Amino acid sequence: MECALDAQSLISISLRKIHSSRTQRGGIKLHKNLLVSYVLRNARQLYLSERYAELYRRQQQQQQQQQQPPHHQHQHLAYAAPGMPASAADFGPLQLGGGGDAEAREPVARHQLHQLHQLHQLHLQQQLHQHQHPAPRGCTAAAPVAVAGAPAGCAGALSELPGCAALQPPHGAPHRGQHLEPLQPGPAPLPPPAPAALCPRDPRVPAACSAPSAPPGAAPPTVAASSPPASPAPSSSPGFYRGAYPAPSDFGVHCSSQTTVLDLDTHVVTTVENGYLHQDCCASAHCPCCGQGAPGPGLASAAGCKRKYYPGQEEEDDEEEDAGDLGAEPPGGTPFAPCKRARFEDFCPDSSPDASNISNLISIFGSGFSGLVSRQPDSSEQPPPLNGQLCAKQALASLGAWTRAIVAF
């Protein structure tokens, strides 16, 4: 999708800018706020463009539908002759003689109609001799029947009508002592067999019809037995993240040589070499790094190390750098951060970024871009922020785990 490509390119550019400005004072926070505001603006433009494009398409379709009815009004007069009235096209060819009164007043018309019936019977007999299957002949043989008493120019136009309409007797026109013989089109065609009779013999559907239909009450237990039991997934409910993180902006800005990133959607831990990302792992009970951190004081201080994120936090971070490391690296394994205040040594600002870790971050952030677009109308209703910090806080309050992961920079 274009959205996924745009999200990946946007995240890759932002990661490069943030990584190149990690040595500047306040550079990471600046580019983080720029990233959030830029993403929100682009998502809003994308949402509005798609919405207006859909509205424009609907309006064009409505205009086309309003212009089409005048062309369809004259279609029902296709079989009517030029000299016939418009209402004549709505009747069959044998119903245009004026009913029984017209036949009684015009003996010549009745005689012509009788001759037409005789010709029709002769034609049917010839077709029965020629073809042994008389099923489709009952309707096609009546096509050349013309209307008695109608103008001569109408016969050619009325012959185009379906033949089945010619077999209909005139309504309210009983035969009054005429020598008209009853119309016998031959043996009636066999009705089509019922679908239930062909269903057991049809090889295409052997199981759907041969087996007796189960009652409606028995279907839900079968479906319930085949489907696995639904386990309460805490990651699917937004209340899980609210309980795990008291405030939406509880992530601090840390510069370290090795950093661990936890994806809030999939709970996947990604380690960034020479990076800039750090996210709290101890607040969630389902995080795998809680059991691998330093025992004793490290785990005990995990609950008490939470604090609000405000603009002056970086200065406090600089003052508290001498307090010591609260986390310990497990021997022979990937380093995990048991607390948000954990520090790592050997920070090298001149090293190049790891391409594989950046691609992992791009895949993590690209997966949540659809959620950002879907919830964009809620964030567009808010007033414009005064600065970048308020923009980040409003984005965290209005959006979900995707921007929380962005604020981890």
Curated annotation (Swiss-Prot):
InterPro entries this protein is in? Answer: IER
- Give start-end positions of Low complexity composition bias: 196-212, 220-237
Q: Where is the composition biased (Acidic residues)?
A: 313-324
Stretches of Pro residues bias are at: 184-195
What residue spans carry the region label Disordered? Answer: 168-237, 312-335
Per the UniProt record, one Pfam family is: IER
Q: Which family does it belong to?
A: Belongs to the IER family.
Task: Tell me which PANTHER family the record gives.
Answer: IMMEDIATE EARLY RESPONSE GENE (PTHR15895)
Q: Report the protein name in the record.
A: Immediate early response gene 5-like protein
Q: What organism does the UniProt record list as the source?
A: Rattus norvegicus (Rat)
Q: What is the lineage of its organism?
A: Eukaryota, Metazoa, Chordata, Craniata, Vertebrata
